[in-house]
């Protein structure tokens, strides 16, 4: 079974590019990372930074998660991210996404030993 940390990497990490390559980026990535397998995942964020830099956020600014838990952390610096949001015309299995590139602080939930990101909570 895929670990929570491995799932975070599959769903949210794209260190190979510094930003979204094209407006088609989300359509390609959401499919290749298996985020459209049994349904269209409505919203997803990819982070274009090294895994080490994203894992380091777990020792940065402690903030409350959207669900009220206290194991969320906000990055001190902004990071290159791509937001993928399902379009109005999207219909499973032909999931369609709008690609939006941004520089924002990320908020992740961390757990385990080693203490690593397991959930992408928000960007601010």
Swiss-Prot record:
Its EC number is 4.6.1.18. GO terms for biological process: defense response to Gram-positive bacterium. PROSITE patterns: RNASE_PANCREATIC. Glycans are attached at residue 34. The keyword Glycoprotein applies. Disulfide bonds join 26-84, 40-95, 58-110, 65-72. GO terms for molecular function: lyase activity; nucleic acid binding; ribonuclease A activity. The keyword Glycoprotein applies. InterPro entries: RNaseA, RNaseA-like_dom_sf, RNaseA_AS, RNaseA_domain. SUPFAM superfamilies: RNase A-like. It comes from the Eukaryota. Keywords: Disulfide bond, Endonuclease, Glycoprotein, Hydrolase, Lyase, Nuclease, Secreted. The active site is at residues 12, 119. GO terms for cellular component: extracellular region. This is Ribonuclease pancreatic.
């Amino acid at each position: 079974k895929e670990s929570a940390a491995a799932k975070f990497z599959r769903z949210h990490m794209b260190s190979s590019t510094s930003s979204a390559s094209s407006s088609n980026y989300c359509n390609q990535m959401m499919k290749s990372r298996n985020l459209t397998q049994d349904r269209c995942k409505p919203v997803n964020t990819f982070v274009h930074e090294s895994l080490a830099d994203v894992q380091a956020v777990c020792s940065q600014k402690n903030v409350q998660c959207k669900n009220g838990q206290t194991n969320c952390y906000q990055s001190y610096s902004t990071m290159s991210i791509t937001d993928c949001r399902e379009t109005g015309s999207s219909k499973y299995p032909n999931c369609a996404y709008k690609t939006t590139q941004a520089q924002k602080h990320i908020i992740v939930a961390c757990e385990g030993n080693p203490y690593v990101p397991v959930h992408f909570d928000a960007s601010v």
